Amino acid sequence: MDYIQIGRVTVSRFILGSNPFSGFSHQSPDVDLLMRRYYTAAKIKEVIRAAERVGVNTLVARTDFHIMRLLLEYRDEGGGIQWFAQTCPEVGDHETCVERATMYGATACHIHGGVMDHLLAQRRLDEIPPVVERIRERGMLAGIAGHNPKVFEWAEQNLDVDYYMCSYYNSASRDERAEHVSGMEEWFRDGDRRIMTDLIQGLSRPVIHYKVMAAGRNNPEEAFAYVATVMRSGDAVCVGIYIKENPGMLEQDIRLLERGLLGCDGG
């Protein structure tokens, strides 16, 4: 496993995502429910342990009660994965989410991508600098996520953060509400992927690439080969896995990423 530095923190280049753990399939309400039924607390902890065994040291997950309780149990049982906390608009405001991240031992905290998209549309991005300052005051790395490239164009001019989380797909309208709603209309366009990855090349902060699989729609070999061509040396990729039908998905995804990166390095 390769590692990068984000601020003072060493981060595995493959980061474990948690949308499947929380039942966010971005496919349909039926698949959301299947994920929730499959991913019991015990099963989630099993997957995180497996990730740690192969060198993954970072989990991106929400500041909701389900995740926080699970991480508390996981650590009490000896787990050591570091938590990059994502704010959670449907269960609390910015300040509440930052305090939860602090209380439950997050290493970093970033603003939810849907929130950033929404605030951009509502012309309210001036709310964000004080939140970043609060995150830093609590001793965590600070970041933002987003699906709309314009979020990062704004951030480059107006925000001092430690990292960005850039979605390859601007897959839904967040103009009227920030949170994801199960069953909402979503789209995954190749053109959006290219626009975001072109933008990433000029960004001044480390980037965690996410939604690289288009929520399971992309062929894994193509997806990770593409990721390898656009990841910079200080970037990482965040991938959620749903292993019900493919128990070896974690190892497969890591292998595909490492093979792609090796090819890009001329190995």
Q: How does the language model describe each region?
A:
Residues 1-76, 226:
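N-terminal binding-site loop/beta-alpha segment at the start of enzyme catalytic domains
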Residues 6, 10, 31, 43-49, ...:
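Structured C-terminal cap/extension of enzyme domains
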Residues 15, 58-60, 110, 165, ...:
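Conserved beta-strand positions in the central sheet of alpha/beta enzyme cores
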Residues 25-42, 83-93, 118-121, 213-219:
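Active-site mouth loops of central-metabolism enzymes
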Residues 63-78, 90-96, 115-132, 149-154, ...:
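Active-site-adjacent beta->alpha loops and helix N-cap segments on the catalytic face
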Residues 76-80, 103-108, 136-138, 157-165, ...:
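Glycine-enriched alpha-helix->loop->beta-strand junction motifs that scaffold or abut catalytic
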Residues 112-115, 163-173, 230-246:
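Glycine-rich phosphate-binding active-site loops on the catalytic face of alpha/beta enzymes
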Residues 155-187, 198:
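Histidine/lysine/aspartate-rich catalytic loop segments that bind and position anionic ligands
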